[in-house]
């Protein structure tokens, strides 16, 4: 009897390991790269730096996967193409890096794409896709899955972003705050928050959101990642 139980246990472990290995291989094949280029470039005025461009695509034959891939190619692929054209002409690059991360939640894939620009600006893109249903994952679906209402989500998001804003500019003197329009900037930042901000489920099962925070210098605003719900 003990021998039978031991044999069954071994079989279960082997099946589990095989299943996990299959799932891991399936996940690896689920995403491919439209661009995968690394190198070093020096322009005609002597600006030199390493560049790295990696832009993902979803490997699935559905209308939603095709739509997401087109959006990614238009937003991030075109950016890379512009840098290639600049290299051909010996001109300066305005973007040097584009990278992506994949977060899995069962059959759900969430892609986070980050691309930098000169001046410290970062562009973010978040996309969700369910391989089981072959459909795009919307913000509303994420909240429903987590059992969170839109009101609760927006309240937490505003609290988180306000904390980020205040922490970001905590070192500014009252004089500089007044000159920069600190209160107006905070009001503007919170006013940008709605259900349209891209969100995704991260590796810990928390919800992360791409938000805009008003800036006292440089661009009017910059993108940041906010985590209104960090639990799984």
Regions found by a protein language model. Name each.
Residues 21-232:
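Compositionally biased intrinsically disordered regions enriched in Thr/Gly
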Residues 4-23:
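Sec-dependent N-terminal signal peptides of Gram-positive bacterial secreted proteins and lipoproteins
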């Amino acid at each position: 009897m003990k021998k039978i139980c031991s044999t069954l246990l071994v079989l279960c472990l082997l099946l589990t390991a095989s299943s996990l290995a299959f799932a891991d291989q399936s996940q690896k094949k689920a995403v491919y790269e439209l661009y995968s280029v690394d190198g070093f470039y020096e322009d005609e005025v002597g600006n030199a730096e390493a560049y790295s461009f990696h832009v993902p695509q979803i490997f699935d034959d559905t209308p939603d996967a095709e739509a997401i891939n087109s959006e990614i190619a238009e937003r991030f692929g075109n950016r890379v193409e512009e840098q290639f054209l600049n290299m051909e002409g010996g001109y300066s690059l305005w973007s040097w890096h584009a990278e992506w991360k994949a977060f899995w939640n069962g059959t759900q894939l969430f892609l986070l794409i980050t691309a930098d620009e000169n001046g410290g600006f970062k562009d973010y893109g978040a996309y969700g896709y369910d391989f089981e249903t072959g459909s795009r994952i919307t913000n509303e679906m994420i909240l429903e899955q987590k059992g969170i209402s839109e009101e609760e989500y927006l309240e937490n998001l505003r609290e988180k972003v306000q904390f980020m804003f205040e922490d970001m500019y905590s070192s500014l003197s009252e004089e500089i705050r007044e000159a920069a329009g600190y209160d107006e900037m905070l009001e503007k930042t919170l006013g940008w928050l709605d259900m349209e901000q891209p969100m995704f489920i991260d590796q810990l099962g928390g919800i992360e959101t791409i938000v805009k925070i008003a800036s006292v210098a440089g661009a009017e605003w910059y993108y940041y990642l906010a985590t209104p719900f960090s639990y799984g």
